[in-house]
C-alpha cells in the first residue's frame, strides 16, 4: 500500500515497475541496505572494485548457463544496461545495426528512445535519434501478429532495409511492460535464437 501527500491510499500492483517484488520497504531489504552502508562509501566499481560487487558477480557467473568465460557487470538503471549492451554488441561483432520491436520500451536516453517501439509519449519532440536502429512487429495475437508474421517481418527487414551481416544484436523483451504486458510466444523466442545463431547476431 502507498499513501500520497493528500492521504490517499494506493495498492501497488506493479511492484514499483517490478523492482519491489518483496513489497515496499521490506524489513529484510532495508536491513541488507543498512548493512551495505557500513561496507563502502563510494560505489564506482570501475575506479575501485569492492567485495560486494565482486562476490555477487562471481555468484552469478557460477550459476549462469553459459559455457566458457563469463563476465558480469551491474548498472544503475535499465537504460544504462541497455546502452552498455548495445555498445558491447557493436564492439564484439564489429557491426552497427540493432533490431528492436514494436511496443518495446528501452528507456529515455537517446539510444533508449531510438530502441523504444512507440512514438507517443516517448519520442515526440525529440530526435534525431541514433542511426542503424530498426523495428519489426512484436508477436502478439491480440494485435493480429502471429509468430509467423513477426518472423516474416524480420525476413522482409533483412531483404529490404539491412543486411543481417550488418546487425550486431536483436533486443527483445520476453514480457513487454509498456507495450501492454504482452508475453512473447516461446516458439518465437526459439526461432529468434536460431535466426541469430545463423547470422552471428547477438540476442
Give residue spans per PLM region.
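PLP-dependent aspartate aminotransferase-fold enzymes
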Residues: 58-169, 186
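Glycine-rich loop-to-alpha-helix module at the N-terminal edge of alpha/beta enzyme cores
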Residues: 9-95
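Active-site and channel-lining beta-strand-loop segments
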Residues: 1-11
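Flexible, glycine- and charge-enriched loops at secondary-structure boundaries
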Residues: 46, 147-148, 182
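Alpha-helical transmembrane segments of integral membrane proteins
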Residues: 176-178
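Catalytic PLP-binding core of fold-type I/II PLP enzymes
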Residues: 164, 182-203
